[in-house]
A protein has these predicted regions:
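Amphipathic alpha-helical dimerization/coiled-coil segments
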Residues: 1-9, 79-107
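Residue-level detector of secondary-structure transition/capping positions
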Residues: 33-34, 58, 89
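Functionally engaged cysteine thiol sites
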Residues: 37, 41, 56, 60, ...
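Beta-hairpin "wing" of winged helix-turn-helix
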Residues: 58-68, 75
Length: 107
């Protein structure tokens, strides 16, 4: 049986994934750590918007900020998140196989 802690953890993940930009950040960080400006450019959002999304993801415990001199880069908070995102994508594509084709994804 799920505990309140399990429920809260899944709710935090659901909140993080409920926004396309935050989902994009998680998928990008699954590949490699990145600076906020690079994430903003890659996802087509302002740096201020990216800052807000990263703050949300930090608050959810999904990403970590790593100081690097005068700059800060971000990474997934735990390597298990990378595997979880991979599995979640597999499930989505299994349940809705027609959402992605050679021209992109609609899901």
């Amino acid at each position: 049986m799920a505990t309140v802690t399990h429920t809260a953890a899944l709710a935090r993940l659901g909140h993080a994934l409920s926004d396309a930009t935050r989902s994009g950040v998680l998928l990008a960080l699954r590949e490699a750590p990145a600076f906020p400006s690079d994430l903003a450019d890659a996802l087509g959002v302002t740096r201020q918007a990216m800052s807000n999304h990263l703050a949300c993801l930090r608050g959810c415990g999904l990403v970590e900020a790593v100081p690097d001199g005068r700059r800060t880069w971000y990474r997934l908070a735990d390597a298990h998140l990378s595997y979880a995102l991979d599995e979640l994508l597999r499930v989505v594509l299994y349940v809705e196989p027609d959402c992605c084709d050679g021209e992109g994804c609609t899901c």
